[in-house]
Amino acid sequence: MGTSSTDSQQAGHRRCSTSNTSAENLTCLSLPGSPGKTAPLPGPAQAGAGQPLPKGCAAVKAEVGIPAPHTSQEVRIHIRRLLSWAAPGACGLRSTPCALPQALPQARPCPGRWFFPGCSLPTGGAQTILSLWTWRHFLNWALQQREENSGRARRVPPVPRTAPVSKGEGSHPPQNSNGEKVKTITPDVGLHQSLTSDPTVAVLRAKRAPEAHPPRSCSGSLTARVCHMGVCQGQGDTEDGRMTLMG
């Protein structure tokens, strides 16, 4: 007897939910097509088609500045921030578009705060659901996030610190209004964080700032729907403190 795509997806999700027992409780979704490859954004008839895309991993590195493993099948997302490519196996190998509305899971409380963009469906959900049609779309989004973070950091002017300077240090140190000699120190504001990756695991990581809100259950905050073009969409709380991409 054959197995329907819905049954296969649900089986894959059960394997995912039972195989990840970390505090984050990964929520897994497949990426349609072959990760590490790019293509123009699709029209409605192409969205979520699950077909291989034309370019290879070199395009990933050119666009995002990071290498992508050839065997990757999933991408980790945490509150709209790219975390890593995940090697296939942890969440199964799935590329079936989610064109079946009846495959939506029942809403229930869940601790999961991770999300794999793509077209199969989550078991427990996450606080942020992203609409990502293709790998190209994902790369453009990730690059935009990196540029926004860099631009936001550059707009923070360095604040000089002053400290007394002992006699004989420097020829003509600056003086304050009281005539006291001071030296100026420009602090490191952390603007030069490289984006690197392990060949198989982490590519980009999200850094939670001290002011970020503590993790919350996504009970009641997950709203997900599936359109017939295979695009998983939803909306949730995206305010989670200031987050930056770092290596």
Swiss-Prot record:
Residues 1-52, 147-183 are annotated as: Disordered. It is found in: Cytoplasm; Nucleus. Coiled coil: none annotated. GO terms for molecular function: hydroxyapatite binding. Induction: Up-regulated by hypoxia (at protein level). Its main location: cytoplasm. Residues 1-28 have a biased composition (Polar residues). GO terms for cellular component: cytoplasm; nucleoplasm; nucleus. Phosphorylated. N-glycosylated. Keywords: Cytoplasm, Differentiation, Nucleus. Expressed by cementoblasts, a subpopulation of periodontal ligament cells and cells located around vessels in periodontium (at protein level). One of its GO terms (biological process) is odontogenesis. May play a role in development of the periodontium which surrounds and supports the teeth by promoting the differentiation of multi-potent cells from the periodontal ligament into cementoblasts to form the cementum. Binds hydroxyapatite and may promote the biomineralization of the cementum. Also promotes cell proliferation. This is Cementoblastoma-derived protein 1. It comes from Homo sapiens (Human). The gene is CEMP1.
